[in-house]
Swiss-Prot record:
Coiled coil: none
GO cellular component, one term: mitochondrion
Subcellular location: Mitochondrion
Superkingdom of this protein's organism: Eukaryota
InterPro entries documented for this protein: MTERF, MTERF_sf
This protein's name: Transcription termination factor 1b, mitochondrial
Site (Interaction with DNA): R144, R184, R332
Annotated segments matching region Interaction with DNA: 151-152, 229-233, 306-313, 337-340, 366-373
Amino acid sequence: MASRNIWCVRRNFLFDLRGWMLQYSAEVFLKSISFRTFSVECDSKDKESLEEEREDLLSNLVTMGVDIDMARRRQPGVFNKAVTNEQELKIFLLSKGASDKVIGSIISRYPRAITRTPESLSKRWDLWRKIMASDLEIVNILERSPESFFRSNNNLNLENNIKFLCSVGLTHKCLCRLLTNAPRTFSNSLNLNKQMVEFLQETGMSLGHNDPRDFVRKIISKNPSILIQSTKRVKTNIEFLQSTFNLNKQDLLLLICGPGARILDLSNDCTKKNYTNIRERLLSLGCSEEEVQRFVLSYLNMVFLSEKKFNDKIDCLIEEKISASQIIENPRILDSSINTLKTRIRELSHAGYDLSTSSIALLSWSQRRYEAKLKRLCG
């Protein structure tokens, strides 16, 4: 009898426990449904709010003359930002003298500009003004290269770069050239600029230059873009010049402090490919190895000419009975476009000027000087 009572007590307890658990589970389940419904409602409201903000952003950008398709292609992530400052950016740039058209162009090409705060922009502008003479000069740089100003909002890094470049002896004029022609220099990390400067100083010393700081100034003044290249690229180009032209240290030093500085930042593959083409083309015309090297060293800008451009210009001159030896003695004529060469050759021929026996240097003269000469020839 006692055992049956105990069994009944256990059974009632278990039924009560199961009922309590079912009730508790139902409450939890209903609460979770209620919470989920609330969450969905919140997500829906947030989504609607975000969509409204995006519509406002697009409307603002269209009103500002921004090319939306271009901006999306370049930096699509900007359109997903929760906060943007396009109106503040417009007001800021207008206050600096930028036109509506320029502002639209800047944002179209570098949309991330609208994520910068007015405070950050103002600080960065003040730092640039320490180098540039006027707001308009900065606006012109932004119009040409918006990335240079808006790429980074690390104003401390910019300030440190300016201090460092001044410390290695760069003049205010040189800093202006850097900011105008290679503004990305100031967006580099400070360590990156230090690495290049240290590399150039070591290179100058290894070639016998007695003032490493002066060597750095000369290279940067000749080639402002060098600080945005890798030390590996510059080193490879220096080695190429030395080995290709069999230069001793003194001659190599003179070359890279002068005309050779301009090709130090050229792609290594491009340098070798273009030189190989020049060499093979001139050898095919009967020039000697010595003449080829003299030709290139006398005007290293030749290395910037692509294979097609160089060959087309040579063909144009050869077709007009101008000899390879004349070209070797006047490398600067290859600076002129093919259209200019053809036009001048035709005009000189009509004026009775025989290019096959006379100087061809006037093919590379300035337009004003050339026209004065042509007028005298025509009498």
